[in-house]
């Protein structure tokens, strides 16, 4: 993106300052025609003259190479790891359920900001909780999706948050790839930790139903689906 921005600024300099000399950007200054102006001044002047200062592009992750025919290769730059243990309770009469406690440890590499990372882990788990316990998808007979927005399916709220929500960052995490601070992505991977909630609900159904029918519980494990499985 920086290349395209700089090209646009260069064209602006040529036109606005009536020059065709070589342009040099260095230490927050711009040099041309034996002139020196601050980069801030250039940006402000360009902005006031309605010069677009944004650009877009595509990023291609390095080292990714997968043969779709043989299914061999490297699908990801690196992996993140995590573990979660979830404790749940279910009501045998209604199918309602509640997460009592979740304990998570997650690998974020060499963390840049542990507070932000912890928040991302918590958010990813809750998002996955919605996927597996509340967000039921349905269609009409003609294939039209009826649950098309949060007004037509239930997303998790503060009420679905576990009573005890323990999150720890793996303090020996390290990314062998040359990325910023040797950190790891933490936005989406914790999403999968919520699978532990679904497995815990299946185990609860198994114990409540004397070992019967737990394999019939489908995701999302709504109160209705749990009740159907119990009876």
Predicted regions: what they are:
Residues 2-231:
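C-terminal catalytic domains of large/alpha subunits in multi-subunit enzymes
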